[in-house]
């Protein structure tokens, strides 16, 4: 479906001043009235003073039109109180329930919310849209709250530098795609719509786990053939789980599936890939996470993906191998050896 992307300036609020939230906020600020909120007032003050987010995007200048706001209610009200506004939650998965709860509790005005996080919730193994729906039901918000996810192959630093990328938006209502395209589809960014919330979220979660596997393979010096095999067979694992959870096969052939997997599994800016490389070098998980300093979602959701695969009775041997290396003391080299010893079968 072709949609017009010519729109008047919108009001947007970003909740979360990490790398991705800051990069996308800076991109949107070129055309819109954008406010960025974060939990650390000192960090926000530094962004305002220097025009950059040195904690997450060092050396990258941000749009001079981007404004920061330390007061949560003031920041949310900027977009939520406008009938055409959009609130973008840029926290990790662990912060999504809190943000949804706080937005749902502001009254009965119409709210439009997108989130940027990828993964499953620890403990419940819920997808982000399931978490949001649970919070809205608990708050009695049966209408007037449109929600969705913006996802796809995108390194924050490249977006902040204005380099081209393409993303997918999937939402609870079709009009949310129009809203996201009006907000972000300009300059070097293209936004494509989808109605498969489950599929795009499964793709965004599983690719992080698979990127750890390809990073380990590369770290062991196993070559490009091995990398291609892991990406391809990993895509098969992603698709099997996605179908079992209610997603559609074609989604995994798009930006939120194979597109995001290729980027995260092969790009040197990928934190999850770096985890795999460092595991192959013999570092412990604690050492790796301390050196990264930022979230590597593949570590957080590997066990959830493996548990869901077991519950759905589907085979995900690469994912299972990643879990064994991360949490059970198996070396990366032994994990590869075990994968190579699996019985022959049809593709």
UniProtKB/Swiss-Prot annotation:
Pathway(s) the chain acts in: Membrane lipid metabolism; glycerophospholipid metabolism
InterPro entries to which the protein is assigned, alphabetical: 6-PGluconate_DH-like_C_sf (IPR008927), 6PGD_dom2 (IPR013328), G3P_DH_NAD-dep (IPR006168), G3P_DH_NAD-dep_C (IPR006109), G3P_DH_NAD-dep_N (IPR011128), NAD(P)-bd_dom_sf (IPR036291)
Residues annotated as binding NADPH: 20, 39, 118, 156, 271, 295, 297
Coiled-coil portions: none
Residue ranges of the TM segments: none
Its biological purpose: Catalyzes the reduction of the glycolytic intermediate dihydroxyacetone phosphate (DHAP) to sn-glycerol 3-phosphate (G3P), the key precursor for phospholipid synthesis.
Name under which the protein is recorded: Glycerol-3-phosphate dehydrogenase [NAD(P)+]
Source taxonomy: Bacteria, Pseudomonadati, Pseudomonadota, Betaproteobacteria, Burkholderiales
């Amino acid at each position: 479906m072709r949609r017009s992307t010519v729109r008047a300036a919108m009001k947007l609020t970003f909740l979360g001043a990490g790398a991705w939230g800051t990069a996308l906020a800076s991109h949107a600020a070129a055309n819109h009235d954008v406010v960025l909120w974060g939990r650390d007032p000192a960090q926000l003050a530094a962004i305002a003073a220097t025009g950059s987010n040195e904690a997450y995007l060092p050396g990258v200048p941000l749009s001079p039109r981007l404004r920061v706001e330390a007061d949560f209610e003031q920041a949310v009200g900027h977009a939520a109180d406008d009938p055409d506004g959009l609130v973008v939650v840029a926290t990790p998965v662990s912060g999504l329930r809190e943000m949804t709860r706080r937005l749902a509790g502001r009254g009965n005005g119409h709210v439009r919310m997108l989130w940027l996080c990828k993964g499953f919730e620890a403990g419940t193994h819920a997808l982000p849209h399931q978490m949001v729906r649970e919070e809205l039901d608990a708050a009695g918000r049966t209408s007037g709250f449109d929600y969705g996810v913006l996802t796809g192959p995108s390194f924050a630093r490249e977006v902040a530098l204005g380099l081209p990328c393409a993303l997918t938006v999937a939402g609870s209502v079709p009009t949310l795609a129009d809203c996201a395209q009006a907000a972000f589809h300009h300059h070097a960014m293209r936004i494509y719509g989808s109605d498969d919330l489950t599929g795009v979220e499964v793709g965004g979660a599983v690719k992080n786990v698979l990127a750890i596997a390809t990073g380990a393979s590369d770290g062991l010096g196993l070559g490009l053939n091995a990398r291609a095999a892991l990406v391809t067979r990993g895509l098969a694992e992603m698709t099997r789980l996605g179908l079992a959870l209610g997603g559609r096969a074609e989604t995994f052939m798009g930006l939120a599936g194979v597109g995001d997997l290729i980027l995260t599994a092969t790009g040197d800016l990928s934190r999850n890939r770096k985890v795999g490389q460092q595991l192959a070098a013999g570092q412990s998980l604690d050492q790796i996470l301390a050196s990264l300093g930022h979230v590597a979602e593949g570590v957080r959701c590997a066990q959830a993906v493996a548990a869901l695969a077991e519950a759905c009775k589907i085979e995900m041997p690469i994912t299972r191998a990643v879990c064994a290396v991360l949490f059970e003391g198996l070396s990366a080299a032994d994990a590869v050896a075990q994968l190579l010893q699996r019985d022959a079968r049809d593709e």
